[in-house]
């Protein structure tokens, strides 16, 4: 048995990739802002798979929502309107972008009805669902990221993720 780690992205390349500013465009027909087309499409297909899962999360997190799919986030929020959502971003710029796009104004009736979105890391062991679309292939240490996600999941919680490779 070997003790070598599987090949992964070079840490310098991962840091450079993470520092890139990801364009956020208008959605279809000039609608809600969207992330990269492929990321939105993969996320849309992942969201469809949630119909097979009977557990309705009370708390869930969207890891790197700006890169992973802003339109998909809206689909998830519609599917789980009563669940508390955490949005986790690794850079201050993307965190602000997520706040700008995903926060409802104080006067919006939807803000009064739904659980508020929190733009911070969730407590360990608190999530019933963790959503990470098209992210794992971008991090320097995928095993450490999966271990971190595992710590945030509650017993019987589940991870929905996609990646290249």
Protein language model features and the residues they cover:
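Class I SAM-dependent methyltransferase Rossmann-like catalytic core
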Residues: 1-58
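A short glycine-rich, Lys/Arg-flanked "PGG" loop and its adjoining helix->strand segment in the class I
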Residues: 143-158
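Short catalytic micro-motifs in class I SAM-dependent methyltransferases
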Residues: 134-135
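Class I SAM-dependent methyltransferase SAM/SAH-binding core
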Residues: 47-124, 129, 144
